Amino acid sequence: MARVTVQDAVEKIGNRFDLVLVAARRARQMQVGGKDPLVPEENDKTTVIALREIEEGLINNQILDVRERQEQQEQEAAELQAVTAIAEGRR
C-alpha cells in the first residue's frame, strides 16, 4: 500500500523531494506535536499516515504553513492574555 500511496502522493505534491519534506513535516507534527491524523490511523506509522493525508489532498505545504501560522498566533494571543492578567494582578 505504501508504494501506491507514494506514487499518488508524488502526483499531488509535484516531485518526490518536496513530498519527502512535506510528509516528514506532517509526520513530525503528529509524532512530536501531538496533532491528530486527518485520516483513520489503521495501525499505520505516522509517515504512512502523512502520505495518505497528502494523497487525499488534505495536506500540502501551503496548508501546513497556514496551520502553523494560526497556531502561532493563537499561542501569542494566549501568552499576551496571560501577561496582561499577571500585570493586572500586580496593580
Curated annotation (Swiss-Prot):
GO terms assigned for molecular function: bacterial-type RNA polymerase core enzyme binding; DNA binding; DNA-directed RNA polymerase activity
Name by which UniProt lists this protein: DNA-directed RNA polymerase subunit omega
UniProt xrefs under Gene3D superfamilies: 3.90.940.10
Lineage, top ranks: Bacteria, Pseudomonadati, Pseudomonadota, Gammaproteobacteria, Enterobacterales
InterPro entries named in the record: DNA-dir_RNA_pol_omega, Pol_omega/Rpo6/RPB6, RPB6/omega-like_sf
Quaternary data: The RNAP catalytic core consists of 2 alpha, 1 beta, 1 beta' and 1 omega subunit. When a sigma factor is associated with the core the holoenzyme is formed, which can initiate transcription. The rRNA transcription and antitermination complex (rrnTAC) consists of RNAP, NusA, NusB, NusE (rpsJ), NusG, SubB, ribosomal protein S4, DNA and precursor rRNA; S4 is more flexible than other subunits.
GO biological process: bacterial-type flagellum assembly; bacterial-type flagellum-dependent cell motility; cell motility; cellular response to cell envelope stress; DNA-templated transcription initiation; intracellular iron ion homeostasis; nitrate assimilation; protein-containing complex assembly
EC assignment: 2.7.7.6
Main EC class the enzyme belongs to: transferase
Gene responsible for this protein: rpoZ
PANTHER family xrefs: DNA-DIRECTED RNA POLYMERASE SUBUNIT OMEGA (PTHR34476:SF1)
Keywords: DNA-directed RNA polymerase, Nucleotidyltransferase, Transcription, Transferase
Function of the molecule: Promotes RNA polymerase (RNAP) assembly. Latches the N- and C-terminal regions of the beta' subunit thereby facilitating its interaction with the beta and alpha subunits.
Source organism superkingdom: Bacteria
Family: Belongs to the RNA polymerase subunit omega family.
Substrates-to-products reaction catalysed: RNA(n) + a ribonucleoside 5'-triphosphate = RNA(n+1) + diphosphate
Cellular component, GO annotation: cytosol; cytosolic DNA-directed RNA polymerase complex; RNA polymerase complex; transcription elongation factor complex
